[in-house]
Amino acid sequence: MSEKSREEEKLSFKEQILRDLEKVKGYDEVLKEDEAVVRTPANEPSAEELMADSLSTVEEIMRKAPTVPTHPSQGVPASPADEIQRETPGVPSHPSQDVPSSPAEESGSRPGPGPVRPKKLEREYNETPTRVAVSYTTAEKKAEQAGPETPTPATETVDIIRDTSRRSRREGAKPAKPKKEKKSHVKAFVISFLVFLALLSAGGYFGYQYVLDSLLPIDANSKKYVTVGIPEGSNVQEIGTTLEKAGLVKHGLIFSFYAKYKNYTDLKAGYYNLQKSMSTEDLLKELQKGGTDEPQEPVLATLTIPEGYTLDQIAQTVGQLQGDFKESLTAEAFLAKVQDETFISQAVAKYPTLLESLPVKDSGARYRLEGYLFPATYSIKESTTIESLIDEMLAAMDKNLSPYYSTIKSKNLTVNELLTIASLVEKEGAKTEDRKLIAGVFYNRLNRDMPLQSNIAILYAQGKLGQNISLAEDVAIDTNIDSPYNVYKNVGLMPGPVDSPSLDAIESSINQTKSDNLYFVADVTEGKVYYANNQEDHDRNVAEHVNSKLN
């Protein structure tokens, strides 16, 4: 074969290699798009490097390949493909055919260079070769066609860079699998952890809201009472369980935790009337007060009667009560009941000592029971009626006067007379000291058959007692009014009290301060009372401490 033929064969082989490398490069670009997740390890050469190295290796082999002597029998020199085939390890010759040795090898008479071993590639990426048929006619094939012998057909094989690159890519991707799996595990862990945090946060929020909701009243609009008994020696947890069963708290355990957190440790045993409108804080405060030994009827409202109130004022106060009572508690019903003679007769029979001197029907008293209803605070229950309420007030007066009944009798006074004097003392003086002195003045005037001359009685007769009266109005009262309560004209006491006196006024009227005073006048602007034992001094006190304030 001529030099030109060899060069052409080399160029043809080189072009084939380049075409194959171009195909590998195109396939590599497709793989890069499809397998973007898989990263080529840092130490694996890229496709471009493989192409460049392979091309340089082929050129070096072509350049350094020695000239093989022509076979004596064929005269066809070995082709470069033969050299590459001999260089590739692990490719066995055809065992089924015995290839005869050349005459030169048998005789050894012809001198010439020994067998030339091609230089091993300096860089191998895969040691497993792939044999494929080439697209051109090799020198061996030409010799086979020219020679008389029919050698065993052989398929010329070369390393296919594309398969090599593909296997290299697959083999290079294998180490990345653990990284991918590890990355997946980390990602799963992070997601699980975030989900856990989200659930924890949501659980904490809803748990906090549940606790707050458990501390609120069961029914904020409920007015009903629930009677609960707390046994002696019950701890906070047991009390919480009892309240939960009674429907007063939503969760007994939360109640006990809250009680400990707020340091409510002094909860007392007993019977309690509690409401569903109470919060946990309200319930704990109520349990600190202590219950009763026996169950009591729930209190729906409280009624406070101030000291010195008249029956008209008491009736108006009762009419302001609101609640789900057994019967309607109105001012009209109250006034009708205190004037009911049947009811009065029953009361006299029930409280004989208190009511034995009660003003008679034709005494001129506006209300026979005026002054007999003790001023205090009363509990209004579901079963409370007008009659039961008045009876409770009479019972309170009887109870407070019981210690003084014998003393009143020893002073030659009736209960009605004492209460009448006390009703005037209640309004004329504000301090206990003054009340005792004023009571002494009244007794001195009574003992001398002098009219009491109290403006309080005149105001009651006019229906103005209890109203805001100015100093000018007080001075200008009608002392000539035709009324049994006109103590300017009438000597002695009125038919009965004009208001409900306080216990202090009652005691001051029983234990009056003795003196020779017959007059008194109060400076309402200063709250000071001036006393005198003669008319001249009294007139001077009036001019100085009352009339001077009118200008």
Curated annotation (Swiss-Prot):
Topology Cytoplasmic: residue spans: 1-187
Entry GO CC: plasma membrane
InterPro entries: MLTG-like
Extracellular topological domain residue ranges: 209-551
Keywords: Cell membrane, Cell wall biogenesis/degradation, Lyase, Membrane, Transmembrane, Transmembrane helix
Membrane-traversing stretches: 188-208
E.C. numbers: 4.2.2.29
UniProt protein name: Endolytic murein transglycosylase
Organism the protein comes from: Streptococcus pneumoniae serotype 2 (strain D39 / NCTC 7466)
Lineage: Bacteria, Bacillati, Bacillota, Bacilli, Lactobacillales
